[in-house]
Amino acid sequence: MILACHNLNKSFGDHLIVRDGSFHVEDREKAALVGVNGAGKSTIFKMIVGELPLDEGDVILTKGKTLGYLAQHQNLDTTNTIYEELKTAKSDIIALEAQIRAIELELKSLSGEELTNRLNTYNRLMSEFESKNGYAYESEITGVLKGLGFTEEEFSKPTDTLSGGQKTRVSLGKLLLTKPDILLLDEPTNHLDLNSISWLETYLLNYPGAVLIVSHDRFFLNRVVTKVIEIENGSVRMYTGNYKDYAQKKQMIRDAQLKEYLNQQREIKHQEAVIEKLRSFNREKSIKRAESREKM
């Protein structure tokens, strides 16, 4: 398990968002958080990442694990181009590469023990660089940008000239490249065309970490998630399976609730008819029996 939410409680004044809501996300699991507009999905995301305080409850992220959050509104560095902005997601690799290149220049003028020490450092840094797939980070950036619908000609566009939708795509690409252990994605398919949505589906299915998604695109959810977490009238319930499985189980619950309601209504009408019949006898004993049924 990578994320656990226990007995979450949150209200805004008299407006209840969630009462004693609990759910969890396993390592590498792809899950959806669903509910009608205003149910509290984005609020729960903000509580998970600490942007909003909880009234009560606990949010537990496994120690040592990282969390990345794509909100519906993002801030970008307006001095960067699209490509430069995504490079910031690989700043650790770029810093490693700079250290390696600096040591390579030093090695030419070193000898003896000093050379041995610097070679040890060089080998350690190279091992770390390779483990982070450092040789491929530029092609990885290019692949993500193209997957999200940007052409190579657009890579050099300044971020301050982009539309809101383009900025959201840049923010999504940047988050994907940071590769946190769990991704929280709020409406990730907004501003994506069909090809980009298809690319994102494949990317998330192969993503090595966990993913928790809020989306109105049920077709996207159906292809990506294996668990659905529903928030409804302040209550939280988990369903195993994709979105189609959830919808079928939800319909079965509604059908059972409707059947129970109709049975109750039939029983009420039956009791009312018996009461009316007993009262019509206008005898003391019958009236007492009728009053007894009214209390049932």
Model-assigned labels for residue ranges:
Residues 1-262:
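ABC ATP-binding cassette signature C-motif
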Residues 110, 276-288:
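Short intracellular "coupling" helices and adjacent cytoplasmic loop segments at the cytosolic face
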Residues 142-148, 273-277, 295-296:
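Short amphipathic coiled-coil heptad-repeat segments
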Residues 250-274, 290-296:
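Intracellular alpha-helical coupling/juxtamembrane segments of multi-pass membrane proteins
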